[in-house]
């Protein structure tokens, strides 16, 4: 489902993948899969005032599926902030061990509960609260997955670094100054954002030092590419997240063979 760019949701051309998929499901009839899982960004809950979420769930309900959803953040497993909505539908008897009578705040936050409350009665009757085990506590932060001595050519120029710093608000610049005051190696994840300030669209660079990366994008994605601002001995240096680092953030071991070319 397309929620980037024009945010056309289920009506966007790229969302034809869902309708094409659903047409195949409907034609299967008794041969249709008993369990279906769909993944999308959390923004689906509010897309077109919740109508896209309702439409999608209604397709499952009308086809005789029980359906529920969970919001799961990759931060539970890896130092990357990447919240995704997982819609799980099942036709047939539901194992009691996989369902619960009420939402779980870990996987069913208020935004999801509010979207469920807004469902029409017929679709609401098909809703199920899925039960998930809690994952073990994450034991790595962003710094643990970064290369301390990357190839020299990946570093951006001093001018590019200063230009990015100039795009920061005082709050974010203070965070950088605090890192510069510490002689130890440190790295913060940086995104460029368009913010509305005094009715004008302004490009801002925003940095986080919480041991987390922001949501990684694909080369063809519509969001800002993530950068790293590395500080050591009072010097700031700027570079992108490397392909191998991105793979680590996605949970892949270093033994995984990356394809040729840029992948992050």
Regions inferred by a protein language model and the residue ranges of each:
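Short catalytic/ligand-binding loop motif for oxyanion handling, primarily in non-cytosolic enzymes
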Residues: 1-3, 44-47, 78-81, 94-97, ...
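Residue-level signal for well-ordered alpha-helical scaffold segments within enzymatic catalytic domains
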Residues: 3, 20-23, 27, 248-251
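Short glycine-enriched, charge-decorated loop/helix-capping segments at active-site entrances
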Residues: 5-12
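Short linear capping/connector segments at secondary-structure termini
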Residues: 6, 39-41, 263-264
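Conserved Class I SAM-dependent methyltransferase catalytic core
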Residues: 14-91
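Flexible, glycine-/basic-rich loop-and-beta segments that form/coincide
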Residues: 80-155, 159
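C-terminal target-recognition/interaction regions appended to catalytic cores
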Residues: 145-264
């Amino acid at each position: 489902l397309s929620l980037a760019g024009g945010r056309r949701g289920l009506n966007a051309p790229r969302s034809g993948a869902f309708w094409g998929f659903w047409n195949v499901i409907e034609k299967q009839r008794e041969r249709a899969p008993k369990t279906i899982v769909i993944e999308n960004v959390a923004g689906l809950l509010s897309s077109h005032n919740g109508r896209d979420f309702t439409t999608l769930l209604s397709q499952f309900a009308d086809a005789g599926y029980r359906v529920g959803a969970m919001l799961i953040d990759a931060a539970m497993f890896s130092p990357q902030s990447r919240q995704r909505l997982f819609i799980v539908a099942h036709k047939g008897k539901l194992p009691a061990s996989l369902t619960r009578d009420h939402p779980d705040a870990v996987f069913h936050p208020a935004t999801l509960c509010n979207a469920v409350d807004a469902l029409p009665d017929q679709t609401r009757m098909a809703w199920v609260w899925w039960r998930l085990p809690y994952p073990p506590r994450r034991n790595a932060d962003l710094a643990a997955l970064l290369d301390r001595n990357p190839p020299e050519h990946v570093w951006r120029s001093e001018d590019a670094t200063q230009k990015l710093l100039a795009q920061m608000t005082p709050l974010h610049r203070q965070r950088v100054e605090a890192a510069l005051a510490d002689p130890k190696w440190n790295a913060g994840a940086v995104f460029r954002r368009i913010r509305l300030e005094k009715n004008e669209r302004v490009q801002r660079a925003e940095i986080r030092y919480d041991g987390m990366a922001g949501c990684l994008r694909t080369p063809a994605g519509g969001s800002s590419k993530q950068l790293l601002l590395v500080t050591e001995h009072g010097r700031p240096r700027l570079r992108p997240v490397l392909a191998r680092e991105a793979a680590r953030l996605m949970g892949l071991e270093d033994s995984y063979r990356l394809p040729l070319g840029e992948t992050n």
